[in-house]
């Protein structure tokens, strides 16, 4: 459970850092540039802790997928980025993949055969 909490912290750090990239104007503005560096530092530190308890494939898929969805939603809501129906479908598929990655495998749900 702690791994999933650390994954949320890593995602939040990555989203904050990526959102600040635009404001940093190519690292020419000090405050947003500091937010980018600190945010990515937090993101990768907590991602490294996540990998102690969650398989790397699952952790990276969730981290990158949810990061893309959240950053796209922020850009759409706050910066007026255009998002058509296919964009919403794509984000829905990413969320579905997250839910599938988090679910137990079908093999673990099967009952052992008696013979």
From Swiss-Prot:
PANTHER family from the UniProt entry: MULTIDRUG TRANSPORTER EMRE (PTHR30561:SF1), SMR FAMILY PROTON-DEPENDENT DRUG EFFLUX TRANSPORTER SUGE (PTHR30561)
A Gene Ontology molecular function term of the record: transmembrane transporter activity
Pfam family, one: Multi_Drug_Res
Stated role: One of the determinants for resistance to ethidium bromide and quaternary ammonium compounds.
Bilayer topology term: Multi-pass membrane protein
InterPro entries: Small_drug/metabolite_transptr, Small_multidrug_res
Protein name: Putative ethidium bromide resistance protein
GO cellular component: plasma membrane
Residues annotated as transmembrane: 4-21, 30-47, 58-79, 85-104
Record's keyword terms, sorted: Cell membrane, Membrane, Plasmid, Transmembrane, Transmembrane helix, Transport, Transposable element
Localization annotation: Cell membrane
Protein's organism: Escherichia coli
Signal peptide, first to last residue: none
Annotated family: Belongs to the drug/metabolite transporter (DMT) superfamily. Small multidrug resistance (SMR) (TC 2.A.7.1) family.
């Amino acid at each position: 459970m702690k791994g999933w909490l650390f994954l949320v912290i890593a995602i939040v750090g990555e989203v904050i850092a990526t959102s600040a990239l635009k404001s940093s104007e190519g690292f020419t503005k000090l405050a947003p540039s500091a937010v980018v560096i600190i945010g990515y530092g937090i993101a990768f530190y907590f991602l490294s802790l996540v990998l102690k308890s969650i398989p790397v494939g699952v952790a990276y898929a969730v981290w990158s997928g949810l990061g893309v969805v959240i950053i796209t939603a922020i850009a759409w809501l706050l910066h007026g980025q255009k998002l058509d129906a296919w964009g919403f479908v794509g984000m829905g598929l990413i969320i579905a993949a997250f839910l599938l990655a988090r679910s137990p495998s079908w093999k673990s749900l099967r009952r052992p055969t008696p013979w």
